Design a protein with these regions (language model features):
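Compositionally biased, intrinsically disordered low-complexity regions
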Residues: 25, 43, 99, 124, ...
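Generic structural hydrophobic/aromatic packing signal, biased to beta-strands
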Residues: 46, 50, 179-181, 235, ...
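A generic structural motif
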Residues: 13, 209, 262-266
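C-terminal helical accessory/scaffold domains
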Residues: 1-139
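Compact mixed alphabeta submodule
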Residues: 242-267
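Intrinsically disordered, low-complexity regions enriched in small/polar residues
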Residues: 3, 56, 76, 85, ...
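Acidic, glycine-rich low-complexity segments with interspersed aromatic residues
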Residues: 25-34, 141-248
């Protein structure tokens, strides 16, 4: 017995497997599950369902991010080609329905069976590993996340390539400021990027800005004045940058500046 999927169907299954089935967020999984029954009013019914079943509220940033994930608008322009076929939703008046291409996929019972099994697997992983959220975030303390996971779960409109993040990045729209630290520094990196980020206690960290910054730089000020500016600073740490397998960071929660900042020149 051979299961036959079209090229588009295979790509959709690959996308769900690679991007969503880890269960790091419930939203897209429950959305896909609902599309097996409902073809219209998808986002409105999803918001209601998540609120009732998971006590999970979708604000405007979250809604936009989920829609972008499901319409191939979240990836960077270079990455859009990879899953060009993976557009699951289309705009309908003040909500979304399923896209014509996805509706065609759903006419294949074999595709539907694989999709449902994959989505149920993702939902079970979410419940076991990712449902115990830290405060009001979509993140779980001490779980591992990639750069892309962080951009998605902080509800950014678009993904950012790691090179553009380079240690930290402020997203104006969501007012989130993730910091990514490589804790195990290598000897062969340039002196200007050999930042001396290190923990001085289990809840205190010395973190160095990007090179070429002063106390007056906008990114430095956003960090130092995060509380008064309403900026949400989140910390992600990985032990070794050469971790070729996962390239994931441990999520360590929110951080605030102590007010003891010093300016210095790298040797």
């Amino acid at each position: 017995y051979t299961i036959r999927l079209s090229e588009d169907e295979e790509k959709a299954i690959e996308f769900i497997s690679k991007k969503l089935a880890s269960g790091k967020r419930i939203h897209e999984l429950e959305l896909l599950k609902r599309t097996l029954q409902y073809h219209h009013g998808i986002i409105g019914s999803l918001q209601k369902h998540l609120s009732e079943k998971y006590q999970c509220e979708m604000d405007e940033h979250c809604t936009e991010n989920v829609v972008n994930m499901m319409t191939n608008e979240f990836p960077t322009s270079a990455a859009k080609k990879t899953y060009a076929q993976c557009v699951f939703l289309k705009k309908e008046q003040d909500d979304y329905g399923i896209s014509d291409s996805y509706e065609k996929m759903l006419q294949n019972p074999e595709f539907c069976a694989i999709l449902e099994e994959l989505v149920d697997f993702g939902i079970s992983r979410y419940k076991v590993n990712y449902s115990y959220h830290y405060q009001d975030t979509n993140l779980v303390l001490y779980q591992k996340y990639t750069y892309e996971d962080a951009c998605r779960l902080l509800n950014w409109e678009r993904n950012e390539v790691p090179l553009n993040i380079g240690g930290y990045k402020y997203d104006k729209k969501t007012k989130t400021f993730p910091i990514f630290i490589n804790y195990d520094k290598q000897d062969n990196i340039s002196d200007t990027t050999k930042y001396e980020d290190h923990f001085v206690a289990e809840n205190r960290l010395i973190a160095i800005s990007k090179s070429g910054r002063s106390m007056d730089s906008e990114d430095v000020q956003n960090f130092l004045k995060a509380t008064e500016r309403g900026i949400d600073v989140q910390l992600f740490v990985r032990k070794n940058k050469d971790d070729k397998i996962s390239k994931e960071f441990y999520y360590l929660g929110r951080v605030i500046a102590t007010g003891n900042a010093k300016q210095f020149v790298m040797p």
